[in-house]
């Protein structure tokens, strides 16, 4: 195995590299996401992509985005790849434009719902899907200095094209997805969370005639996700009720996911979106095998209600790339995550928060009902509680399933709740957290076991 101290763009990083987590490379800028890392990632992405052609780069509004994108661009062009810089855009714009223009791949500079001090890199292949695990592994091998690069002609550098004009194509794709549906005069509130959604969401809803109120509607890298957006729905709920709106939509930092609220401020999460949209597709006989694809985080109430409609709910590990893979394998038309990532085969299997919001609002308007009416016809979720426990040690987070006190506590919880409850413990792929989720028909059991298991995680994995 080659152990190269240097690649053509500088020192390799050895074992001190962040790997591809649940959604790309992500971490604190300056300690994890550094210019040196981004330069090397750009170079090795350029080397590893399977086809010829330009590489697209987009970013959310984080202050560090320009640094990350510039370093990635330097690496990509050193690898001989022409770069098209989209500027501020939602994550889904990258894969959609990759396919539209036949690009070799793309990168999105974003840390999604993470705090402003973090940033990250998502990588897409020529098909618009997240890069396959074997190609991610090859990039990581390059970062560690384990790939021989002597056969590459490093004089063949490429150039940079500023391509923010391509966002007009993305906006057209959004509007074409809802066809002739309109929203004339419908009062709607959008929380754009100072992030990527500011590039297109308000324009799209206004083009359809909505009576629009916009919160946090300018790009602001120091406030992205801070007390707003899909991770903090309070401002949206208050604004919807104060303004008498019939619905509201909140996006995360890179706008690949969305959560909604109805006119009373009730939350419509990804499970409800899949159930409601899936029911429409079922009625239209446009849902192969009556199948929806969701993750292990989706609610048991959702699963049982969907099965009562004669449907199949297929579950995957957490991460929209797993949902995507399962949908491709089974031919499913709709899938997603409780957190608000929704993937539709009719829209390229790409999680798009703005598009999902447009679909929900236009479907409601076309049916002559409110989102609240639709929610009333949906399912009753089981009580569910998610507790995030900070565990700084990555090694301990990854080894949680070998912790005997925790395994024993999980077993006790499962035996107590039986078939009317479940426990899910997992290490976050994007943050230094172990997530504990408990759901059951009995809310008191949920509270007891979620708190108890979180305490066991803290005491066992953070012990000196």
UniProtKB/Swiss-Prot annotation:
Active site: 112 (phosphoserine intermediate)
Family: Belongs to the phosphohexose mutase family.
The entry's keywords: Isomerase, Magnesium, Metal-binding, Phosphoprotein
The UniProt record lists the keyword Ligase: no
SUPFAM superfamilies for the chain: Phosphoglucomutase, C-terminal domain, Phosphoglucomutase, first 3 domains
Chain sites annotated for binding Mg(2+): 112, 252, 254, 256
Listed cofactors: Mg(2+)
Protein name: Phosphoglucosamine mutase
S-S bonds: none
Organism: Synechococcus sp. (strain CC9902)
Gene: glmM
InterPro entries: A-D-PHexomutase_a/b/a-I (IPR005844), A-D-PHexomutase_a/b/a-I/II/III (IPR016055), A-D-PHexomutase_a/b/a-II (IPR005845), A-D-PHexomutase_a/b/a-III (IPR005846), A-D-PHexomutase_C (IPR005843), A-D-PHexomutase_C_sf (IPR036900), A-D-PHexomutase_CS (IPR016066), Alpha-D-phosphohexomutase_SF (IPR005841)
Modified residues (Phosphoserine): 112
Origin superkingdom: Bacteria
A GO-annotated cellular component: cytosol
